[in-house]
Amino acid sequence: MPQEQYSHHRSTMPSSEGPHIYKVGIYGWRKRCLYFFVLLLMILILVNLAMTIWILKVMNFTIDGMGNLRITEKGLKLEGDSEFLQPLYAKEIQSRPGNALYFKSARNVTVNILNDQTKVLTRLVTGPKAVEAYGKKFEVKTVSGKLLFSADDNEVVVGAERLRVLGAEGTVFPKSIETPNVRADPFKELRLESPTRSLVMEAPKGVEINAEAGNMEATCRSELRLESKDGEIKLDAAKIKLPRLPRGSYTPTGTRQKVFEVCICANGRLFLSQAGTGSTCQINTSVCL
């Protein structure tokens, strides 16, 4: 009985200890560090936003494109000068209407035409020293489509009405040339010359040399040969002069005459002999030796 009273007394005693309170959160230096990092993050976000707006302003970003680059329904449109650091692949490149299209490079500009297997078919290279074209055939045509120049492995064709060579040394052909007409400009000389080799002119239907307003000269160092195998050689002129024919020896008798007769040796050589009452060719046969 006393034990039960003690238990009851213990249960009815008022408790002097209150309930325990646990604080949850960040306090002290941890809280200050957190606020510092949040503030730093906000500053970085503002700087990033400002830099983004500045880049958009400098690069001129718009709804249609960026800077001089415009995106249209037909493709890309570039205004002003453009620089490509890597190869450019395009189906068509054209300038604005009324403006020229320029290609500039510090070294060269190369244009390649490829097939389906990416093999180069034709190539155009414009360098600082030369313009080179690679291909099976090279053609130059007018706006109407008329052929002006063509070149391939077999032949070179000039389709213009006239081919003019303005060089001081003329034109050098290391091999033969075929043409229906060789003509100089009006009031200009036409000279056909072979300094170290022979000059041969051939035609199946004849060769005509005509000088309508001037003289015609044929000069050689050794022999000048006129040969007709099946026909004849005609010298048709009002005056024919042979000023340097050799003269046979003669004995002056009476008055000295200035009239000579033309004699022909058996070997075809011509010489002059002073005319007399009769033929004097037999007297000067020593010239034929």
Curated annotation (Swiss-Prot):
- Keywords in alphabetical order, please: Cardiomyopathy, Cell membrane, Cytoplasm, Cytoskeleton, Disulfide bond, Glycoprotein, Membrane, Signal-anchor, Transmembrane, Transmembrane helix
**Where do the record's glycosylation annotations fall on this chain?**
N60, N108, N284
Organ and tissue specificity: Most strongly expressed in skeletal and heart muscle. Also detected in stomach and uterus muscle.
Q: Which disease is it linked to?
A: Defects in SGCD are the cause of cardiomyopathy, an autosomal recessive disease which is characterized by progressive myocardial necrosis and heart failure leading to premature death. A large portion of the 5'-end of the gene, including the first exon, is deleted and an alternative promoter and first exon are used.
State what this protein does. Component of the sarcoglycan complex, a subcomplex of the dystrophin-glycoprotein complex which forms a link between the F-actin cytoskeleton and the extracellular matrix.
**Known partners and oligomeric status:** Interacts with FLNC and DAG1. Cross-link to form 2 major subcomplexes: one consisting of SGCB, SGCD and SGCG and the other consisting of SGCB and SGCD. The association between SGCB and SGCG is particularly strong while SGCA is loosely associated with the other sarcoglycans.
Entry protein name: Delta-sarcoglycan
| Species of origin | Mesocricetus auratus
